[in-house]
């Protein structure tokens, strides 16, 4: 009998997710059982942890398990666990709302591409709501461990606009999820169909999965039912590696990550000696939707002596490896460890160092053994990995070796060139690794700063990610070679410079001295200086900054973060070989000369910044000079 019954509306995001999920996951509908068993496993883990300090929560029943039963007459499947259970407040919080930051943004990213939506929803983690793929009504009966039998809770919904919640009597702790199957989903009333799904998805979990099966006498007559354990019920990471199949590793990844896609690679290691721990680390094949939400917790599952302690433990991985998934099971931490204790713990620091090293080794091996798969990894997680160059001094060179760049060598926007690749192709006499930062690959590829390098056949790395200016400021050299921006006014080609060209340049500087003086006189304090340049072949002018000054891209980064950046004062460089520059140098009329210098300066600023402060004035001036 139920009391205190109320009907409540779903949070709007839940309604939207339910409709999208039912349609986009229909082809993969059997995962509902995996998700519900996974939830039961989590509930058992949470009870074990709380019972460390409150053993009375076991209520005399310490054999944790999940039981699955079928009622063909009623058309129901019941998934029952004796884990931690839920209070009325927890039921409303967990089953009526989605308490995840960025949920609206996530839902807005979903569209009409069913296959893509399926992957996205899988990454989001549908859990309990997957029940509605096969059921037109779901009933939940639950009681929190340690609460009175009268404090049971009933939750029921048809998966549409609302749900009902009420108080009930429930003798045993834990949760029963009763699925009232749709008429066209009766295939799941087959015991053997359920056995097959459990064998496929849930054999690896440490919780016993039992199914209610019929018993027969010698004559084949049904005599009753019994509970039969149908999974290994041994935590996968405690088993020997040679006993575990690739499929089991993949399914375990999906169990702990709630991702639908297979992982890219994994590493399972048992360490004995000064420290004793087992780690199972995975690199996902796709970036989760919330990867760049800093408030979203990312981390490993922590077990101490095979007892689950907590999820999303971030201290064992540096932030730039936040995409790593997996678990750590250690004997070197106390069972009552808290997040606060972990922060200050020497054991934690030692484990973090070891797990970081292991993760980077996994990526190094992937980059060496499978270029195509590593490219897939880089496309998904490259932006995050770049953060490591500035955040992890101890592993800076290892991280830098894993970074991939677009380059003038490939004529492609794909970031596939490593620093080692670049060094192997360096020209004789070349002492530096040259790079260029810009707003986009197209802007970088078409930058006038490349003209001399293209002419001489010198490779340049093209950086156009938003993080790149920050990233490159922390990477000043690699393998003994300095990294040098080609947009700097004091660019030095060293042994790559042409001696004959240098002599010609000296003559031109004398010829154009008065021209440069006139130009600087007009531009005044708007520029640092006006000089001739020999880095251009097709363009009349560029602007550049000194090596110790803030670059254009860094100033943009400051502005994007809402911070005040120092004003960038450029060197204005003019190409003496260009016909336009030669013509302007001969103009005697001061007003006309100034108009042309202004036009060239604005053109150079536009090429450098991508925008002008006064585009209308620029267009008027250009039209005026073209019509003259």
From Swiss-Prot:
Stretches the record annotates as A: 1-339
Residue ranges of the region described as B: 340-556
Cross-referenced InterPro entries: HATPase_C_sf, Heat_shock_protein_90_CS, HSP90_C, Hsp90_fam, Hsp90_N, Ribosomal_Su5_D2-typ_SF
GO molecular function, one term: ATP hydrolysis activity
Keywords carried by this UniProt record: ATP-binding, Chaperone, Cytoplasm, Nucleotide-binding, Stress response
Highest taxon in the source lineage: Bacteria
Region (C): 557-628
Protein's UniProt name: Chaperone protein HtpG
Originating species: Glaesserella parasuis serovar 5 (strain SH0165) (Haemophilus parasuis)
Gene name tied to this protein: htpG
């Amino acid at each position: 009998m139920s009391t205190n019954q109320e009907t409540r509306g779903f949070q709007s995001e839940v309604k939207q997710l339910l409709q999208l999920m039912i349609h986009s996951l229909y082809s993969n509908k059997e995962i509902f059982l995996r998700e519900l068993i996974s939830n039961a496993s989590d509930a058992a883990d949470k009870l074990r942890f709380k019972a460390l300090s409150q053993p009375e929560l076991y209520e005399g029943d310490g054999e944790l398990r999940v039981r699955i039963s079928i009622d063909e007459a009623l058309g129901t499947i019941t998934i029952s666990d004796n884990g931690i259970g839920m209070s009325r407040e927890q039921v409303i919080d967990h089953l009526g709302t989605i308490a995840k930051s960025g949920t609206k943004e996530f839902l807005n990213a979903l569209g009409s591409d069913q296959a893509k939506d399926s992957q996205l929803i899988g990454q989001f983690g549908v859990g309990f709501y997957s029940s509605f793929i096969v059921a037109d009504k779901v009933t939940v009966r639950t009681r929190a461990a340690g609460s009175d039998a009268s404090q049971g809770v009933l939750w029921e919904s048809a998966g549409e606009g609302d749900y009902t919640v009420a108080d009930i009597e429930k003798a045993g702790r834990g949760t029963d999820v009763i699925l009232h199957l749709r008429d066209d989903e009766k295939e799941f009333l087959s015991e053997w169909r359920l056995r097959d799904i459990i064998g496929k998805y849930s054999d690896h979990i440490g919780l016993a999965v039992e199914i209610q099966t019929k018993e027969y006498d010698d004559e084949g007559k049904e005599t009753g039912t019994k509970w039969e354990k149908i999974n290994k019920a041994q935590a996968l990471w405690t088993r020997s590696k040679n006993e575990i199949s690739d499929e089991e590793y993949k399914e375990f990844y999906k169990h702990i990550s709630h991702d639908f896609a297979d992982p890219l690679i994994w590493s399972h290691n048992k360490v004995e000696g000064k420290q004793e721990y087992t780690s199972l680390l995975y690199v996902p094949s796709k970036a989760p939707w919330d990867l760049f939400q800093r408030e979203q917790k990312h981390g490993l599952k922590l077990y101490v002596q095979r007892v689950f302690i907590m999820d999303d433990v971030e201290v064992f991985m540096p932030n730039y490896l936040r995409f790593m998934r997996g678990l750590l099971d250690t004997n070197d931490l106390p069972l009552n460890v808290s997040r606060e204790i972990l922060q200050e713990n020497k054991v934690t620091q030692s484990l973090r160092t070891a797990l970081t090293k292991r993760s980077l080794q996994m990526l190094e091996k992937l980059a060496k053994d499978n270029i195509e798969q590593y490219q897939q990894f880089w496309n998904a997680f490259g932006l995050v990995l770049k953060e490591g160059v500035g955040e992890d001094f101890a592993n800076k060179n290892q991280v830098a070796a894993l970074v991939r760049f677009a380059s003038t060598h490939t004529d492609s926007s794909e970031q596939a060139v490593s620093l080692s690749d670049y060094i192997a192709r360096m020209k004789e006499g070349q002492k530096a690794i040259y790079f260029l930062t810009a707003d986009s690959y197209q802007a970088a590829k078409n930058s006038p700063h490349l003209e001399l390098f293209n002419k001489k056949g010198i490779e340049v790395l093209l950086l156009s990610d938003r993080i790149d200016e920050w990233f490159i400021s922390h990477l000043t050299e690699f393998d003994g070679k300095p990294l040098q921006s080609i947009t700097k006014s004091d660019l030095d080609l060293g042994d790559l410079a042409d001696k004959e060209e240098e002599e010609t340049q000296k003559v031109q500087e004398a010829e154009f001295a008065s021209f440069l003086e006139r130009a600087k006189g007009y531009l005044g304090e708007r520029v640092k200086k006006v000089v001739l340049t020999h880095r251009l072949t097709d363009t009349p002018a560029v602007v550049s900054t000194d090596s110790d000054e803030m670059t254009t891209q860094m100033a943009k980064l400051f502005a994007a973060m809402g911070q005040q950046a120092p004003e960038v004062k450029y060197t204005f460089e003019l190409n003496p070989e260009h016909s336009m520059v030669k013509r302007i140098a001969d103009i005697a009329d001061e007003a006309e000369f100034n108009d042309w210098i202004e036009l060239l300066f604005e053109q150079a600023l536009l090429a450098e910044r991508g925008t002008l402060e006064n585009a209308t004035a620029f267009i008027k001036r250009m039209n005026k000079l073209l019509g003259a």
